[in-house]
UniProtKB/Swiss-Prot annotation:
Pfam family, any one: CTP_synth_N
Highest taxon of the lineage: Bacteria
CC terms in the record's Gene Ontology section: cytosol
Protein name: CTP synthase
Native source organism of the sequence: Aromatoleum aromaticum (strain DSM 19018 / LMG 30748 / EbN1) (Azoarcus sp. (strain EbN1))
GO molecular function, one term: identical protein binding
Miscellaneous notes: CTPSs have evolved a hybrid strategy for distinguishing between UTP and CTP. The overlapping regions of the product feedback inhibitory and substrate sites recognize a common feature in both compounds, the triphosphate moiety. To differentiate isosteric substrate and product pyrimidine rings, an additional pocket far from the expected kinase/ligase catalytic site, specifically recognizes the cytosine and ribose portions of the product inhibitor.
Catalytic residues in the record: 378, 514, 516
Amino acid sequence: MTKYVFVTGGVVSSLGKGIAAASLGAILESRGIKVTHLKLDPYINVDPGTMSPFQHGEVFVTEDGAETDLDLGHYERFTSARMGKRNNFTTGQIYESVIKKERRGEYLGKTVQVIPHITDEIKQYIKRGAEGAEVAIVEIGGTVGDIESLPFLEAIRQMGIEEGRNSTCFIHLTLIPYIPTAGELKTKPTQHSVKELREIGIQPDILLCRADRPVPADERRKIALFCNVMPEAVIECLDANSIYKIPGQLHDQMLDEIVCHKLNILARAADLSVWENLLRALENPKHTVDIAFVGKYVDLTESYKSLIEAVSHAGMHTESKVKIHYIDSEDIERDGCAVLEKMDAVLVPGGFGKRGTEGKIAAIRFARENKVPYLGICLGMQLAVIEFARNVVGLAGAHSTEFERDTPYPVIGLITEWQDRSGKLEKRTEASDLGGTMRLGAQVCHLVENSLAREVYGVADIVERHRHRYEVNNTLLARLEEKGLRVSGRAPGTDLCEMIELPDHPWFVGCQFHPEFTSNPRKGHPLFTAYVKAALARKAAATSA
């Protein structure tokens, strides 16, 4: 029978519940326990797929095509568990499901209410997402005290009773702020946060205290006394310069032991040697490399969370410190590409909308003409095709129909139909809804023999995750190929262009998919590792010249 760890947050948002939950999952997994994760988001959107990156940050895409919260990316990177549609749900999904049941008459004429109907639906979703795991770590989004979170908190309160004391554990992440004028840490916000949680009917078993400096033992004893938890269950979460230090930090304070004792689980000792080896590589780099990250959401780097982590993983596996330079593409439109001259490589990530695209195209042209290693992901590949069409093939005004409906050369256009991995035919038009209508999830890509892509991956067929509704226009592709563009990856059966490269360039690759979603610190990802190696080679050549 599955046991549950519920993770809530208090005082302020963005304390790192996702990292804490993922770290606990990593430690429990190292003890031989099969874990899974769930994220419950209290917003009314059905999913984050149509939300602005400035509002929500990155949208993480799972293998089965769910557009989910970025915390699911942390869960996959920290553990071997694969997330899916059942691992993230929102208030919007819950209400949609309940309303559909009411319309079908499943409630037999009863008055449909938050309690019990909404809370019962939440519990059903939690149990469904936890199937097959020994321990399900369930993170409740938002902050205790938010109106939006109340149905979720009531649902997990009920589960605490229904599942039994030895099958549930409640962890509350809170903030211990340091007040410079007083010269001390303050515990009162934590006391009030726990008080609010207890008023709802939830008594936390463990407190994770986020702080920027060590919490003295007497302060921890005070927190334990006034929050009604055992002193050893007051655990400090200190700021760290790498999220991959957190599993060790929590294990050193016996978090996993306390959780296993609470859930009555007998498990082997934790083995965190993999994490220790990764940290050694991270903290003792032999090389340094500078990468220009040209996008339009660079003021909020959470928008590129998985991509940043994937580049970091490549650094670990090449013994390199990767310095990412975030460059707003609109700045390049205004000031030119001089900022790229000292970079060892250029990366253009995915995105939506016309704003900033000309700056990205200028950066791509700089990388192509100056033989700077280039990696274009999703929109970054599409813009590389547009740049090549304009400046090499001579198709003036070439563009994507996403940005210029009447472009004379629509080298990028809407995908009107394709098959998903199950063989189901998907169709789209310009009139289709925005939400949930993209080509999503894991898709097979066949790599051309003797291509750079084939060399990098080392296999003929790969599976990567997609999130896009526009693709390279095959009707114009032949003219680009005549001038040297090479299509190195295609989707079997549909002929969709998945990867492009330039054979006369040291390292120039574009991919329609998002390889960052499958990178993890233990193995890295071959595409990012090869990209960083190319950047290192360019730097070495420039240094010796």
